[in-house]
Curated annotation (Swiss-Prot):
JH esterase plays a crucial role in the decrease of JH activity in lepidopteran insects, by hydrolyzing the methyl ester of JH. It is also involved in the transport of JH. It catalyses: juvenile hormone I + H2O = juvenile hormone I carboxylate + methanol + H(+); juvenile hormone III + H2O = juvenile hormone III carboxylate + methanol + H(+). The lineage of its organism: Eukaryota, Metazoa, Ecdysozoa, Arthropoda, Hexapoda. It comes from the Eukaryota. Belongs to the type-B carboxylesterase/lipase family. Keywords: Hydrolase, Serine esterase. It is an enzyme of class 3 (hydrolase). It comes from Manduca sexta (Tobacco hawkmoth). GO terms for molecular function: juvenile-hormone esterase activity. This is Juvenile hormone esterase.
Length: 15
């Protein structure tokens, strides 16, 4: 599935 922009942001902040 295609991850939404919010999901990508959360993953980036999680780093």
């Amino acid at each position: 599935r295609i991850p939404s922009t919010e999901e990508v942001v959360v993953r980036t902040e999680s780093g």
